C-alpha cells in the first residue's frame, strides 16, 4: 500500500440524537466535538439520526412520517378521496 494516501482510522463515539444512546466504534470520519467516554479517554463525537437503538427494524416499533406528500396535498386541494 502507498503511504500517506489512506485516511486515519481512529475510535470515535457515535450518539443517536433521537434517543441519546452512545457507542464507541472505529471510523475515518472526524469531528470538532469531543466527549469523555466510560474508560476516561476523550474521543471525537459524531451525531447520527438513526442507530440500532432507534431504528424500527431493531426496536420492533413502527414509526410513520406525519408529513403529507405531494399526492396527499393535491388530493386535499381538489377534494379528491
Curated annotation (Swiss-Prot):
Question: Which UniProt keyword terms apply here?
Answer: Ribonucleoprotein, Ribosomal protein
Annotated GO molecular function terms are: structural constituent of ribosome
| Biological process annotations from GO | translation
UniProt cross-references to Pfam families, sorted A to Z: Ribosomal_L31
- Report the InterPro entries cross-referenced here: Ribosomal_bL28/bL31-like_sf, Ribosomal_bL31, Ribosomal_bL31_B, Ribosomal_bL31_sf
Matching entries from SUPFAM superfamilies are given as: L28p-like (SSF143800)
Q: Name one GO cellular component term.
A: ribonucleoprotein complex
Q: Which domain of life is it from?
A: Bacteria
- Report the family membership: Belongs to the bacterial ribosomal protein bL31 family. Type B subfamily.
**What is known about its subunit structure?**
Part of the 50S ribosomal subunit.
What is this protein called in UniProt? Large ribosomal subunit protein bL31B
